[in-house]
Amino acid sequence: MNASSLPAPTLQHVLDLTVYVAVPIEAGTVVGLNSRGKRRIIPITGGTVTGQVNGKVLPGGADFQIVVSETTADLDARYMIELDNGEHIFVQNRALRRGSVADIAKLVRGEPVAPEAIYFRCVPTFEVSSPALEWLTQSIFVGTGARFPDRVQLSIFRVA
């Protein structure tokens, strides 16, 4: 068997998230420049989760971004989900977001941009304490996202 005959992975939809965000804290006032770009911190104020698990995104998390250029940002969001049954899931979601100079400038100003104009892909990982949720720690997950003025929409898929 050679590598080209291996089966291609498939994607299974797992959940959708709506993550509400506050006004970004820009690098000049908080962290400053680093070797890769400017630091931007976007507080997470809440949200919803639907799909194979259902619940809410708790306030208190944040997206710790590095703005690499006028067109590209590396994202590192960390937040807690509380499920309807009271269980908790900690999420670390690393992502890449890029678009044209004009479209990224609109996002920064809080203006809407068509989701298809922005490349926004993520790789979330999950920490759980419940054996019933352990499946979230035993697969690779990927997702696609869209940034709106007050929120981020994410669809998450298990790589099968």
Where are the predicted features?
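Beta-strand-enriched cores of mature, soluble protein domains
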Residues: 1-160
